Design a protein with these regions (language model features):
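Alpha-helical transmembrane segments and their immediate juxtamembrane cytosolic regions
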Residues: 1-280
Length: 280
């Protein structure tokens, strides 16, 4: 949803493609190779298939296509009338595809991206109202309490939006209903979080998103190492989970520091790095 919030409307297709190529697809190619190398060392030959991407990299490819998919928004009235029905139809039909097709999430999460682009800017003034912020805080606390107390009763695979209805043991009607419900609940919780962001910080979220891209991409090979090498060699998975949870905050802060960003910029932001290199 936040990824859609900072998309500029009415951008040309060519400009969107060039920007996405440099910001998303080039880092994807670099980290695709990095992830395959890590997987080959910690879990044997990695599984590679068309449509199936290493852990977490689906988001870069999906964001690239989301930006292209919304280029006609605001240009063609007929498209504006159809974009929401098509987005929701894609969300529902994506549940018919199997899990190995990880790019299915391009369709599953597109409504949230579209919501962030078209609806969130109009809601932001209302989200800043004091009573809305109080209600948002109550909602988030209640959500944490409910999830904590009923954690064993929930199937969290629904949150991934990548499993088919058959894999989740549902028919099309009930599966589609649950998929829509999960998407709606996720947007409501995300709105609650946005409403609690101080107003003076809203303008800096786009820049913050640029820095968090470092944390997102750099955590992927580390996560693969933990999942495929560390956990199978540890007697207590709970101990690993607690340790990782405690270490994740300092890890994120470290990888977002300027020295780490400078060191890894050629991988994460190759275009910006190329611009910074002095021309002889």
């Amino acid at each position: 949803m936040l990824a859609g919030r900072f998309v500029r409307a009415r951008a040309s297709f060519d400009a969107t493609f060039r920007k996405g190529w440099g910001q998303l697809l080039m880092p994807f190619a670099f980290f695709f190779l990095v992830d395959l190398f890590v997987l080959s060392k910690v879990s044997g030959p990695p599984f590679v298939a068309f449509g199936h991407l290493p852990y977490g990299l689906w988001f870069l490819v999906s964001l690239f296509f989301w930006r292209l998919m919304v280029v006609p928004v605001g240009r063609w009235r007929s498209f504006d009338r159809l974009v929401w029905p098509l987005a929701l139809l894609g969300l529902v039909l994506s549940g018919l595809l199997p899990n190995w097709w990880s790019l299915v999430r391009t369709f599953a999460f597109f409504p949230a991206f579209l919501f962030g682009m078209l609806v969130l800017p109009r809601l932001e003034p209302h989200l800043r109202r004091p009573w809305v912020r109080v209600a948002s805080a109550v909602l988030l606390v209640a959500t944490v309490v409910v999830v904590w107390r009923r954690a064993q009763q929930y199937n969290y695979l629904w949150l991934h939006q990548s499993r088919s209805y058959d894999e989740l043991g549902r028919d099309f009607v009930s599966g589609a209903g649950l998929r829509l419900l999960v998407a709606a609940a996720g947007i409501v919780v995300a709105l609650a979080v946005v409403s609690l962001v101080p107003t003076r910080r809203v303008g800096s979220l786009s820049g913050l998103g640029r820095f968090t891209l470092y944390a997102y991409l750099l955590h992927l090979p580390v996560t693969e190492f933990i999942i495929y090498w560390l956990i199978p060699r540890t007697d207590s998975n709970a101990a690993v989970s607690v340790s990782v949870s405690l270490a994740i905050i300092p890890f994120v802060l470290v990888v977002m520091t300027r020295p780490v960003r400078r060191l890894t910029q050629p991988l994460v932001e190759p275009v910006e790095f190329a611009k910074s290199v002095p021309v002889p």
